[in-house]
A protein has these predicted regions:
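Ferredoxin-type iron-sulfur electron-transfer modules and their immediate structural context
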Residues: 1-124, 220-375, 379-396
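Beta1-alpha1 glycine-rich phosphate/pyrophosphate-binding loop at the start
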Residues: 14, 18-22, 26, 52-63, ...
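Short, contiguous strand/loop micro-motifs
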Residues: 32, 44-45, 132-133, 140, ...
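Feature captures the FAD/FMN-dependent oxidoreductase FAD-binding
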Residues: 69, 127, 132, 183-228
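Accessory recognition modules or surfaces
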Residues: 117-131, 165-177
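Residue-level marker for well-ordered alpha-helical positions
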Residues: 143, 180-184, 205, 350, ...
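Hydrophobic anchor at the start of a short beta-strand
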Residues: 154-156, 218, 252
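Short secondary-structure transition/capping segments
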Residues: 169-171, 209-211, 395
């Protein structure tokens, strides 16, 4: 046996062949029969949200960019987060996968914390184009419908007989909802969507014919308060939960029995119905049937066994024994946000990059796969703790 040689510097190295080139020329991707693809899936919390809230997205935005960006993400699907953060029965939380490890994320409290941000412009609004729409009734359905039409570029006027917007929300007790919070939430969404708000229109019932002739579409909100509901515009009633399209330009939104009479705890349902109604109207006005689809595509759910804890993350804290009105501090919100597993949503954790043996993955505003060198081993999909990466058969 030859004695061990101590190598202290480069000069001590024995003579050997050495290449200073790279292996980029060797496109090992031709060996691949499975191809990695990355696409966000629908997590259990979002699939159980009547308003279709992008829950992991807004929590990731809160952690990375702060409450203003998080609120911007929230308001893409929910124009009244301060109300859902206080009134909603939060069906999202019982579905949280984290509950199997310790306790579910307190999503409602995070939403409430984010809603307290002073934000006027939340996201880009489409340029106002053709289409003049009237929404009769400033209840939660009418406001939500008007908001989503407004941010999609339609000119929308909301009319109500009351002196204050809110409709059935005005009847919610002060103990459950501070009137200032309600007013601030409505003012913010009206400003963001560029809505025209005409209140105190006590003669709406008598003016229906004039309104019909002045607007392309007229929507009647069943959650508003006023006499106009008793004198519909003689259209076919429209149920956004079961109808596939709008067949008339004068519609009265109908509600399922479980939402009658108005129930504050079901606020997310009313917002979701307003959103669906706006989608159908957009499809009619833009002659694009694809726009009339639901709020979220329920066919792409994340597989439960694809989501797992990597390092445990922050453990569940003891339930906060605070009054209903007490707000969370930034520290409390961040601690709770860090517990989110981001199920089905890539948060650029870098796990796939770390384990890829071919160094074929990069992160640039999302995942990029170098398919010239990826061999399709599937390690990235196995190691992804969010269930985002899937392996598909390579097409010939």
């Amino acid at each position: 046996m030859q004695p061990k040689k101590s190598i202290k510097c480069l000069a001590d190295m024995p003579v050997m062949p050495l290449t200073i080139g790279t292996m980029e020329w060797n496109q090992t991707g031709t060996w691949r029969y499975l191809t990695p693809t990355a696409s966000n899936k629908i997590p259990p919390c979002r699939s159980n949200c009547p308003a279709g809230m992008p829950i992991p997205d807004f929590i990731n935005a809160l952690k990375a960019k702060g409450d203003a960006q998080a609120l911007s993400v929230v308001m893409r699907q929910n124009p009244l987060p301060g109300l859902t953060g206080r009134l909603c029965y939060h069906p999202c939380q019982p579905k949280c996968i984290r509950r199997e490890h310790d306790s579910p994320i307190q999503i409602q409290r995070l939403e409430r914390y984010v809603s307290n941000c002073d934000l006027i412009e939340s996201h880009a609004i489409a340029e106002k184009g053709t289409g003049n729409i009237a929404v009769i009734g400033a209840g939660p359905i009418g406001l939500a419908c008007a908001y989503f039409l407004g941010v999609n570029g339609f000119e929308v006027t909301v009319m109500d007989a009351g002196q204050e917007a809110g409709g059935a929300l005005l009847k919610v007790s002060v103990e459950k909802l501070d009137p200032k919070v309600r007013a601030d939430e409505i003012d913010r969404m009206v400003a963001i969507a560029g809505l025209n708000l005409n209140l105190g229109q006590t003669d709406l019932a008598a003016s229906l014919t004039i309104i019909e002739n002045s607007y392309d579409i007229v929507v009647v909100d069943p959650t508003s308060v006023g006499h106009v509901q008793q004198k519909p515009l003689n259209p076919d009633n429209f149920d956004p939960l079961s109808s596939t399209s709008i067949v008339t330009k004068k519609i009265v939104v109908t509600l399922p029995e479980k939402l009658i009479p108005f129930k504050p705890g079901m606020i997310a349902h009313y917002i979701g119905i307003g959103h669906l109604t706006a989608n159908h109207i957009s499809a009619l006005m833009k002659k694009d049937p694809a726009l009339s689809c639901g709020i979220i595509d329920l066919s792409e759910h994340v597989a439960k066994d694809c989501v797992r804890l990597v390092d445990g993350g922050p453990a569940a804290s003891a339930p906060l024994k605070v009054s209903r009105e007490k707000e969370w501090s930034e520290e409390q919100a961040m601690v709770e946000a860090e517990r989110c597993l981001s199920c089905g949503t890539c948060n650029e954790c870098g796990q796939c990059v770390q384990y890829c043996p071919e160094v074929s993955i990069q992160i640039h505003d999302g995942l990029e796969f170098d398919l010239f060198h990826c061999k399709g081993c599937g390690i990235c999909a196995y190691e992804c703790p969010r269930g985002v990466i899937m392996m598909e058969e390579a097409k010939a």
